[in-house]
C-alpha cells in the first residue's frame, strides 16, 4: 500500500513518499481529467496508501519513516515533519475513505504528537533534511514549515501550536 522513493522495483515504502503520492493522486482526482475507470483505480490505490500509513503510526502518536515501533534507528523514531506529512496525505482522502473515523482519530493523535514535540520557541525539528550550517545540523525552518502546512490543510492555523509556530517562523 505504500510508495517508496524510487520507481525501481524493490523500493521500500516510506512515510515521506507515500503521503506525497497520496497528495498527488488527490490533485489528479480533482483535476477532472480522469475517466470513471481511472478514478476507481486511483481510489483503490489511495485506500491502500491511507491504510498503510495508518498502520505505521507509532504508540507515541507520531509517524516514523519506515518501521512502526522500532525506535532504535534514527529514521524509525517518530518525527514532526513525517507526522505532519502523513496527516496531510490521509486528510486529503478522508472524505473518500470507507473508515473516515479512523483517519480522524489518527489525525487527532498526530496533533497530540506535534503539540508534545513543539520546542519552547514554537519551532519543530524535522527527522530529515538537516542543515549543515546550523549547530547540531538541525533544520527548524524545514520542520516548522512542514508542520504548518499540515495545520493549514486541516484549517487549524488559529490554534495555539500553529500560532506559536507562525510567530517563530516570521
Predicted regions and their residues:
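An alpha-helical repeat/solenoid feature that recognizes helix-turn-helix modules
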Residues: 1-112, 116-170
Amino acid at each position: 500500500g505504500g510508495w517508496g522513493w524510487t520507481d525501481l522495483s524493490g523500493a521500500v515504502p516510506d512515510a515521506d513518499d507515500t503521503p506525497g503520492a497520496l497528495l498527488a493522486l488527490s490533485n489528479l482526482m480533482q483535476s477532472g481529467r480522469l475517466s470513471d475507470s481511472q478514478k476507481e483505480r486511483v481510489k483503490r490505490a489511495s485506500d491502500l496508501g491511507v491504510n498503510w500509513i495508518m498502520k505505521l503510526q507509532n504508540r507515541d502518536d507520531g509517524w516514523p519513516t519506515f518501521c512502526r515501533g522500532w525506535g532504535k534507528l534514527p529514521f524509525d523514531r517518530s518525527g514532526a515533519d513525517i507526522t505532519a506529512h502523513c496527516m496531510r496525505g490521509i486528510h486529503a482522502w478522508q472524505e473518500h475513505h470507507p473508515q473516515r473515523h479512523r483517519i480522524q482519530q489518527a489525525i487527532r493523535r498526530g496533533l497530540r504528537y506535534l503539540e508534545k514535540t513543539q520546542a519552547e520557541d514554537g519551532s519543530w525539528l524535522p527527522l530529515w533534511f538537516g542543515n549543515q550550517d546550523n549547530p547540531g545540523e538541525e533544520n527548524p525552518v524545514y520542520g516548522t514549515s512542514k508542520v504548518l502546512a499540515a495545520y493549514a490543510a486541516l484549517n487549524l492555523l488559529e490554534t495555539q501550536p500553529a500560532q506559536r509556530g507562525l510567530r517563530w517562523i516570521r
